From Swiss-Prot:
Residues annotated as binding GTP: 12-18, 42-44, 258, 284-286, 324-326
The protein's name: Adenylosuccinate synthetase
List of residues binding Mg(2+): 13, 42
Keywords: Cytoplasm, GTP-binding, Ligase, Magnesium, Metal-binding, Nucleotide-binding, Purine biosynthesis
CDD domains linked to this entry: AdSS
Entry binding sites for substrate: 252-258
Compartments, as annotated in UniProt: Cytoplasm
Cofactor mode of binding and number, as noted: Binds 1 Mg(2+) ion per subunit.
Catalytic reaction(s) noted: IMP + L-aspartate + GTP = N(6)-(1,2-dicarboxyethyl)-AMP + GDP + phosphate + 2 H(+)
Annotated organism of origin: Methanococcus aeolicus (strain ATCC BAA-1280 / DSM 17508 / OCM 812 / Nankai-3)
GO CC annotation: cytoplasm
NCBIfam families xrefs: PRK04293.1
Amino acid sequence: MTCTIVVGGQWGDEGKGKIISYICEKDKPSVVARGGVGPNAGHSVEVDGKKYGIRMVPTGFPNRSSKLAVGAGVLVDVDVLLKEVEMLKEFNIKDRVIIDYNCGVIEEKHKEMDKSNSHLSKEIGSTGTGCGPANVDRAMRTLRLAKEFDALKPFLGDVSDLVNEALENGENVLIEGTQGTLLSLYYGSYPYVTSNDTSASAFASDVGIGPTKVDEVIVVFKSYPTRVGEGPFPTEMDVEEAEKLGLVEYGTVTGRRRRIGYFDYDLAKKVCRLNGATAIALTCLDKYDEECHGLTNYDDITEKGLAFIKEIEEKVGVPVKIISTGPELHQTIDIR
């Protein structure tokens, strides 16, 4: 039995979707439970050359034996969820998704409020998905819950019971986080943050398990960190430099161009401390050194790539255990 939490180490877009899907294929967890704020974060998963962008369904969906749970701490957009269930029907999603009875539900009024608020949309750079206003209503105890919506009835369940019973039965559980620690309402660069905490502790709470149940915390870092929206970015490079390095990316949810920077060892160390990291997953090593593209053996990593990995381990103090060398699941080095 192991309970593993996967958390973003930067401002989101670190490649958590690929890492989570890989771990699901390798470790075969019986339950993949999603924590995080809501549909304001997108994950990209590539399966057999086809790319899927999802915002509600847990990214462990390619593993057909896993139950896919959305914890009570997560906000649900009914339309987004139903569209994803339909989009992923070849993976038998409909019979595997469990939405907690007590998930809060984002309604159209929340999205309108999010988009019309100039402070959120222009100064903060909100995604406009209604999460912030919905969380305000939750705090005011006026937000409607999943159990009140007929469209969600086929998916309803008690996620906390599901996760805890799986662990008690000696099964593997994976808890997937969204966004990144540096967007945390409490530990990020306030006010340029999301509307809730995005640390490993928060994700455990979102799905209803206590801290003593967690065995592993894997923090995901991208070799070149990115950020969508406003806010400080200490190691940000200019657009010309990013283009010269071939680093042009766009957000899964907003479609906005991502700001790109150099790896920040000091912030990485702080993030690992905040999350109690037991391991690091490093993505886009092939962007740092294109000769590493597609590698699956640690001993084949180039001198340049290996030096980068060793520098991270020395300066951050946490071992790099999973390395992504391309978008496909098999383009991964795993030394856990």
